[in-house]
């Protein structure tokens, strides 16, 4: 049965973006519609509300993770989590169907900025399959730090690349602008070092945040602070941590709430195998200064140290972006501690978890 194209468009526009990603491989006609710019706009306007999902980077591949929280909500037991699918990124340099080895990934508005194992850089929409390979001015380095953000003034996506030179406090930064399709330098900084073991960068409404260490960390009472980069102004800013987050906190992690996209901070403090987890939410951002107003949301007591993201409505914490060497354990925290293993055969290496909002947003490709 051959349906009229306008009816097919109407039906597909109401299908969740992550489901459309699966349909693309089953029908060439549907695939052509999904990658069309006019359909992307229609889906954004009339499609179902997109909620964040959890994706996991295991053995250089991106997997979808399904988290069942019914056990918490109904008091029927522990929640569960399992791998339910995979986003595949084909290597354009391969003559076969070989996939790209993804070493790290960063999320913004449904797009993933991926660093490959062989030091290439690609922006990828897993739902539409669209990609854009970003060429360097010289070459990419393994020590490079990246962030993907959006310039609200020019309505264009941008990539920030930070390259430490000589020592971790001497950082050369440059921005790739999707509007001009070129790199340009944004200067050199010598005042801070981004702590990559704690912070991979969290993008909230056009600004990316990290935890950073001041240059005089050995003599300063405020040696750790929040570093932000505004993609519209293309500038860094140093922001203070909440008053309750002292330097003696063992680990500080950033995340973002589901509904209102508010920045969250998780600070752990512990001795032995018992930890306290303090959750802070940025309730206000000063437009002129960029400073944040923090509210302490809750404190949890745990026997493990974890990185999580918040679901305020269900009072549940779900992991956001966490490095777990040698383990594939997914932690879900509610009123108590629950642990369930994500089943996958073989050696998983070092998995990375992050929340992802499915979208059909298009990538500016250039001429």
UniProtKB/Swiss-Prot annotation:
Residues 1-43 form the F-box domain. It holds the Pfam family F-box. SMART domains: FBOX. SUPFAM superfamilies: F-box domain. This is Putative F-box protein At3g21120.
